[in-house]
UniProtKB/Swiss-Prot annotation:
GO biological process, one term: translation
Entry annotated with the keyword Ribosomal protein: yes
A single cellular component GO annotation: ribonucleoprotein complex
Source taxonomy: Bacteria, Pseudomonadati, Pseudomonadota, Alphaproteobacteria, Rickettsiales
GO molecular function: structural constituent of ribosome
Keywords per UniProt: Ribonucleoprotein, Ribosomal protein
One family name in Pfam for this protein: Ribosomal_L27
Family affiliation: Belongs to the bacterial ribosomal protein bL27 family.
Protein name per the record: Large ribosomal subunit protein bL27
Region (Disordered): 1-26
HAMAP family on file: Ribosomal_bL27 (MF_00539)
């Protein structure tokens, strides 16, 4: 006879790695074409002027300039403002 009861195996104890989502460039930061500004699931933040939207809803810069976040009619929007050449 067993002197100890068999220990049950736990059904927990696993977790997936984080997906590294979120804002990658903040308001006023300098970007070049192709720089990722936001990684997201769905369009929590909408693309504005001079930014592109990838098939995974990643927002990226199309031009060289500064990032600008704003809210219009309860939509968060991100633009890239061109820097004037002096």
């Amino acid at each position: 006879m067993a002197t100890k009861k068999a220990g049950g195996s736990s059904r927990n104890g696993r977790d997936s790695a984080g997906r590294r989502l979120g804002v990658k460039k903040s308001d006023g930061q300098y970007v070049i074409p192709g720089n990722i500004i936001v990684r997201q699931r769905g369009t929590k933040i909408h693309p504005g002027i001079n930014v592109g939207l990838g098939k995974d809803h990643t927002i990226f810069s199309l031009i060289e300039g500064r990032v600008e976040f704003l809210t219009k009619q309860s939509h968060k929007i991100v633009n890239v403002k061109e820097i004037a050449n002096v």
